[in-house]
Amino acid sequence: MKTSKFDQLDRIFLPRSAAVIGASPRDGFANTLVGTKIRDRLFMVNPNYQEILGKKSYASILDVEDPIDYAVIAVPSQLVIGAVRECIEKGLKAVHVFASGFSETGLEEGIKLEKELAALAKGKIRLIGPNCMGIYCPKSGLSFNPAATNEEGSIGVISQSGTFAQMFNYFERSMNMKISKLVSYGNAVDLDCPDFLEYLADDPYTSVIALYIEGTRQGTRLHSALKYTAGKKPVAALKGGVTREGGRVASSHTGALAGTGETWSAMFRQSGAIQVEDIDDLMNTTVALSSSPPPGGKGVSSITYSGGFSAVQSDMCVKAGLEVPQFSKEAVGELRKIVPVAGTMMGNPLDAWQMFYRYSGNESRLADVFRIIAAEKHIHSIILQFDVIKFMVRMWGGQAGERLEVIARNFLEGCRYARDEAGKLVLITVYLDPYTDHEQERQLSFFLKKLCQSQGFPVYPTLNEAIRTVAYMYRYSVIRQDGGKGQVEG
């Protein structure tokens, strides 16, 4: 239910105007924001300049005649208190304090400064930070990263770490990860993780939430906010510092209480959030949640091009808590009519290398493979291992691109059927050798990845990442069924 608090945070993410205090013509917030849609409602504040990036620079925010909703305070920590005081006098709704040098230092001076900042802001202005990157919102133009796409999406991101927040921006294009709203909130002297969870839970533009957290001073409230949010939309959560050593680092990073790994795992499970293990898992799972339905069970089928991969995939799936059930006799019979028998393992995983390399003149039948597998009731997820670029280039030479597109488009027709008609989770792997100096291989790999992503399919660089993502998606389906009370096998 939307409240006045929702409206308050909505105004922060969607300000009518904004200012950068401590703006500079060099790299920084000013350079980023002048390239977004908020540029015409952006004010520069720095007494050392008369003009910054073609815009008038004011000595103080109090000198700006226009009303301002939001300001980025990009000055050294010792100047922050004065800047916030002027923002309060100006009547701003909220500020983001970028500077570090507060409680995260562990020094008495920084701790004292943070307490002074919290006391100053309380009841007078909403504050994000300090020690954080702030807000990225394509809809309003707020941003801290010039690499961001500014393309509106449905993924909400809450990160206590500024670097992890930026990673979501850096991988937006390559992972087809479209973001609605993102916040890096740092030391959280005022606005904290529960505030942003509750806001994104009610945000109509956000369908899935990625959360990175290191610690909190509001454990009970966080649990309540997580439960409320996860009850409305999926939340994938990564806790930094679940070991003793990691907890020590997490506490010193943002000054928050880290807690024990067991305590956090219990809270995530009871609230209905999906706990993941690393930043790759967080991004991979979030992308899958934003584009695909969770599987109805743990049965996985894989279409690959190698008997060796078939064996390894089966092991990996079982270790991840999944199952690799065999096809029914009826399905095997139907597959034999389509898949060349020679060199093929007619089982699950389906080692169908000849379909990738030698299928010619009847490629439309490739989609039927997915229709047959999708009809198997004990199969809930399908992984297409499309890591064949090197072999296709070697076999087809200059015609590899044309052959690849024909085969890929027919495979994708089957993938769409499995996802849209049969309700299966479909993931695709496209491997790109990071060290290759073969330009044709590189171009074809990027082409294939983009083609698959254009159809809304999550694409991963490794089989391990795809299988781990299926496992997390299955866990989410279990969480939805039992409200977070049960344990997930595996």
Per-region residue spans from a language model:
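Catalytic-core regions of core metabolic enzymes
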Residues: M1-G490
